[in-house]
C-alpha cells in the first residue's frame, strides 16, 4: 500500500514583520517631497488657468486650484495603488495598521485578499496589508476635499454664530438694564449673577470667535502627538489607520539586529534605531501651555471678557483673520520645503504653523501699538474710486485701477519691481505665489510697501 504523503501543515502565524515602521524623519521628508511636487503641479495648473481665463479668474480660484492639484496628485498615485514620489524617494510604503489577528490568521480570506504577493517584497514570508481602495479613497476625501469644503463653509458658519451671540448679548444687556432700572441701580441687581456670568462667557466667545474656530490648536496638538509617537503625521491617516513601513528589509538597514528584534510592526517599533522628534514635541507642548497661560492671565488681568468694544474689534478682525484661519492650515501644512508656497501663507498673519491663530495680534492691539485708528472690515483708507483727488498724483484711469481685481485701487501697495495693486489683492496673491503678477519677479510679503498720500 502506497504511503500517503502527510497533510500539508498550515504556515506558522506571522508574529513579526520583516518591514519596520518608518521613522518620523523619513515620514517628514516624504511629506516635504510630496508637498514640493504638489506645489509644482499647482503652479502649472494656475499658469494654464491664467492663460485661458485671465489673471483675475486665476487669482479668484487660487484655493480651488491648489486643492485640485493636491487631489489630482493623490488620485494619480495613492488612489491607483502606487507610491507617491515622496514615498519612493524615502523607500516607504503605506500600509494598513490591521489588528494582530489578521497577521496571525493565515486562513482568513479577507487577509489573503489584501496581502500583496505574500508580503511587500514578494518573498513569501508575509507582511503588512496594503490599504484597500475604499480606505485610500477615504483618506483622500478626508485629507483634501473635506478640509477645503470646511474652509469654504467656515465664514458662513462664523457669521451665523456671531449673529446668534450678538442677539443673545443684546437680550441680556436689555434685561440687565431693565433689572437695574427696577432696583434703582445701574449694575443689574443681585439677581443677575447668573446673567452676568453668561454675558461674560458669550462676550468672550464673540471676541475670540475666529481663533476658537480656526482649528490651529487642534493641528498643533496632532503634530505634537506625532513628534512623540512618530506614527500618524496627519489626522486623516489616524482616522483610516494608515502607516508607513520601510520597503528595505530589516536585515538590510543600518542597525539590522536592532530592527529585526525591536522595530517590527508587531513590536510597535519602527524607528530603525534612529532618533525621533520627541524634543520638538516637548517644545511644542511647552509653547502651547505658555500661550494658554498668557492668554488666561491677559483675560483675568484686563477684564476684557466683560469689557466693551468687542464688537468693533471683531468686525475688524474678520477681514484680517478670515483668510488665515483655515486657508493655509486647511492642508495641515507642516512641510518645511521652501518650494511649498502654502507653507508661507500665514506670514502676513504672524502665526506659525504649530502655534495657531492665538499668536496673532488683533487689529485693536496692532492699532494701539502703532497709534493708528482701526477701520472696520471692508473699508479702505485710500479708495481711488471715491474721488479723483484721492492720490491725485496717480494719473490716468487705467493706472488708477488694480490689475488683479480690475477695480479702482484701494489702499495702493507697491512691489519691489514698482507695480501697484490693492493692498488686499497683492497680499492674497503673494501668500499663494511669492512673485509679482505682472513681471514674475520675486515678491515676498514682507517687501510689499503701502503707498500713502502726502
Curated annotation (Swiss-Prot):
It catalyses: S-ubiquitinyl-[E2 ubiquitin-conjugating enzyme]-L-cysteine + [acceptor protein]-L-lysine = [E2 ubiquitin-conjugating enzyme]-L-cysteine + N(6)-ubiquitinyl-[acceptor protein]-L-lysine. It is found in: Peroxisome membrane. Zn(2+) 1 binds at residues 402, 405, 422, 425. GO terms for molecular function: transferase activity; zinc ion binding. GO terms for biological process: protein import into peroxisome matrix, receptor recycling; protein ubiquitination. Pfam families: Pex2_Pex12, zf-C3HC4_2. Zn(2+) 2 binds at residues 417, 419, 436, 439. A zinc finger (RING-type) spans 402-440. Coiled coil: none annotated. Its EC number is 2.3.2.27. The keyword Cytoplasm does not apply. It comes from the Eukaryota. Residues 183-194 have a biased composition (Gly residues). The E3 ubiquitin-protein ligase activity is stimulated by PEX12. Keywords: Membrane, Metal-binding, Peroxisome, Peroxisome biogenesis, Protein transport, Transferase, Transmembrane, Transmembrane helix, Transport, Ubl conjugation pathway, Zinc, Zinc-finger. Component of the PEX2-PEX10-PEX12 retrotranslocation channel, composed of PEX2, PEX10 and PEX12. The three subunits of the retrotranslocation channel (PEX2, PEX10 and PEX12) coassemble in the membrane into a channel with an open 10 Angstrom pore. The RING-type zinc-fingers that catalyze PEX5 receptor ubiquitination are positioned above the pore on the cytosolic side of the complex. This is Peroxisome assembly protein 10. It comes from Thermothelomyces thermophilus (strain ATCC 42464 / BCRC 31852 / DSM 1799) (Sporotrichum thermophile). The lineage of its organism: Eukaryota, Fungi, Dikarya, Ascomycota, Pezizomycotina. The gene is PEX10.
Amino acid at each position: 500500500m502506497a504511503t500517503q504523503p502527510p497533510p500539508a501543515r498550515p504556515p506558522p502565524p506571522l508574529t513579526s514583520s520583516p518591514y519596520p515602521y518608518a521613522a518620523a524623519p523619513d515620514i517628514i521628508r516624504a511629506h516635504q517631497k510630496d508637498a514640493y511636487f504638489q506645489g509644482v503641479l499647482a503652479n502649472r495648473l494656475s499658469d494654464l488657468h491664467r492663460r485661458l481665463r485671465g489673471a483675475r479668474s486665476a487669482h479668484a480660484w487660487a484655493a480651488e486650484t491648489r486643492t485640485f492639484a493636491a487631489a489630482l496628485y493623490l488620485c494619480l498615485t495613492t488612489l491607483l495603488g502606487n507610491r507617491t514620489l515622496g514615498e519612493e524617494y524615502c523607500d516607504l510604503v503605506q500600509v494598513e495598521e490591521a489588528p494582530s489577528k489578521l497577521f496571525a490568521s493565515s486562513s482568513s480570506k479577507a487577509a489573503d485578499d489584501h496581502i500583496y504577493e505574500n508580503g511587500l517584497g514578494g518573498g513569501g514570508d508575509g507582511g503588512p496589508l496594503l490599504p484597500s481602495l475604499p480606505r485610500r479613497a477615504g483618506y483622500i476625501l478626508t485629507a483634501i476635499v473635506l478640509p477645503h469644503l470646511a474652509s469654504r463653509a467656515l465664514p458662513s458658519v462664523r457669521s451665523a454664530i456671531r449673529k446668534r451671540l450678538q442677539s443673545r448679548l443684546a437680550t441680556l444687556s436689555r434685561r440687565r438694564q431693565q433689572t437695574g432700572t427696577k432696583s434703582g441701580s445701574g449694575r443689574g441687581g443681585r439677581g443677575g449673577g447668573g446673567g452676568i456670568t453668561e454675558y461674560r462667557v458669550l462676550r468672550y466667545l464673540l471676541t475670540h470667535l475666529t481663533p476658537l474656530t480656526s482649528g490651529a490648536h487642534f493641528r498643533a496638538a496632532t503634530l505634537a502627538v506625532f513628534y512623540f509617537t512618530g506614527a500618524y503625521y496627519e489626522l486623516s491617516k489616524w482616522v483610516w489607520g494608515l502607516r508607513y513601513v520601510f520597503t528595505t528589509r530589516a536585515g538590510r538597514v543600518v542597525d539590522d539586529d536592532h530592527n529585526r528584534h525591536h522595530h517590527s510592526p508587531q513590536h510597535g517599533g519602527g524607528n530603525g534605531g534612529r532618533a525621533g522628534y520627541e524634543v520638538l514635541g516637548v517644545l511644542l507642548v511647552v509653547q502651547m501651555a505658555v500661550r494658554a497661560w498668557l492668554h488666561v492671565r491677559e483675560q483675568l488681568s484686563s477684564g476684557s471678557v466683560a469689557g466693551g468694544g468687542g464688537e468693533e474689534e471683531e468686525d475688524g478682525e474678520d477681514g484680517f483673520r478670515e483668510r488665515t484661519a483655515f486657508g493655509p492650515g486647511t492642508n495641515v501644512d507642516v512641510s518645511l520645503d521652501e518650494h511649498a508656497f502654502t507653507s508661507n501663507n500665514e506670514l502676513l498673519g504672524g502665526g506659525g504653523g504649530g502655534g495657531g491663530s492665538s499668536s496673532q495680534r488683533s487689529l485693536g492691539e496692532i492699532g494701539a501699538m502703532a497709534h493708528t485708528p482701526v477701520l472696520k472690515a471692508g473699508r479702505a483708507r485710500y479708495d481711488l474710486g471715491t474721488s479723483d483727488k484721492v492720490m491725485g498724483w496717480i494719473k490716468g484711469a487705467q493706472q488708477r485701477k488694480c490689475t488683479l481685481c480690475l477695480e479702482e485701487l484701494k489702499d495702493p501697495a507697491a512691489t519691489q519691481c514698482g507695480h501697484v495693486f490693492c493692498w488686499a489683492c497683492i497680499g492674497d496673491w503673494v501668500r499663494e505665489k511669492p512673485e509679482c503678477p505682472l513681471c514674475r519677479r520675486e515678491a515676498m510679503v514682507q517687501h510689499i510697501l503701502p503707498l500713502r498720500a502726502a
